Amino acid sequence: MKILLDTLGSDKGASELIEGAIMALEKKDFNLTIVGNEEENRNIVNKRFEEKIDFVNATETIENNESPTKAIRSKKDSSMRKCFDLLNEDYDGFLSTGSTGALLTGATLITKRLDNVSRPCLMVTVPSLKGEVVVLDVGANVDVTSDLLEQFAKMGYVYSKNILGKEDCKVGLLNIGVEEHKGDSLRLETYQKLSNYPYFKGNVEARDVLKGDFDVVVTDGFSGNILLKTIEGSVEFIKTLAKSKLSKLDEKSQQIIIPMIKSMSSGIDYNSVGSAPFLGTKKPVFKAHGSSNRNAIMSGILTLIKFIEEDVTDKLKKELTNE
């Protein structure tokens, strides 16, 4: 198995990404190609896993403030563009911490979409009282149609069933109420289309997502991104509030409560989640948070490898053609 790692565009620099990849190599047998500043990257690796690691030099970086389409097309010596070009050859998957917009553009224009996929979507998993919940889209597609949301539901179902092991997967539509007649015209139209699938169980409100009654929550990228950021912000608020209250407790009480708070908040930390796939592409393209630490990169690569081993792309293809 051959994995590509884009080392340009990370907030923490190439070293943190490469150390995370080394940690993944210690846990799993695969071949890694590191794309970026070759001289710097070779120095960081320092001959570890020599038989498993290759290097490709890149002199350009795609920045977050650039036009994604223009950057992907014009910056042919950027690490991200080189990863996309290599992925189209004989590589199995690709992980980057770079621009979400550029990754979506590259996934669409270079890697290409699966048949019957109008646009790839970005998904994440969030913790709940009953295990992990798939949420999609979370930022790739702000403007969507009911047909797109129907595709997202199918792809989320396949991911949840095959990667998370949810055999009796339940899919819900994010809405302002649980009743069938609630929501705008997009939600009403989508509800009718999703009702044709046995795994669709109705609407779900944002406040109920973390209860875990639904294994997959489908929404547009605008609402999904707000939901995700609200969850992240709420966790940070609770952690900050708890710290201020804990400082007033005695040391013994702190020793009991602090581990509980850390355990509760760890699941929503992007460093423990790792990475998120763009579902609907012909080969796996995974996005990690720009501030990901080495543990996140390790987790992200291992998730990417599992995605490949479980042949999720082929299973998505079959689900999307089963009209």
UniProtKB/Swiss-Prot annotation:
UniProt catalytic activity: a fatty acyl-[ACP] + phosphate = an acyl phosphate + holo-[ACP]
EC annotation from Swiss-Prot or TrEMBL: 2.3.1.274
GO CC annotations, alphabetized: cytoplasm
Xref: InterPro entries: FA_synthesis, Phospholipid_synth_PlsX-like
Listed GO MF terms: phosphate:acyl-[acyl carrier protein] acyltransferase activity
Localization per Swiss-Prot or TrEMBL: Cytoplasm
UniProt key word Lipid biosynthesis: yes
EC main group: transferase
Domain of life: Bacteria
Record key words, sorted: Cytoplasm, Lipid biosynthesis, Lipid metabolism, Phospholipid biosynthesis, Phospholipid metabolism, Transferase
Pathway: Lipid metabolism; phospholipid metabolism
One Gene Ontology term from the biological process aspect of the record: fatty acid biosynthetic process
HAMAP family: PlsX
Recorded family membership: Belongs to the PlsX family.
Subunit composition and interactions: Homodimer. Probably interacts with PlsY.
Function: Catalyzes the reversible formation of acyl-phosphate (acyl-PO(4)) from acyl-[acyl-carrier-protein] (acyl-ACP). This enzyme utilizes acyl-ACP as fatty acyl donor, but not acyl-CoA.
Protein's UniProt name: Phosphate acyltransferase
Organism field: Finegoldia magna (strain ATCC 29328 / DSM 20472 / WAL 2508)
Primary gene name: plsX
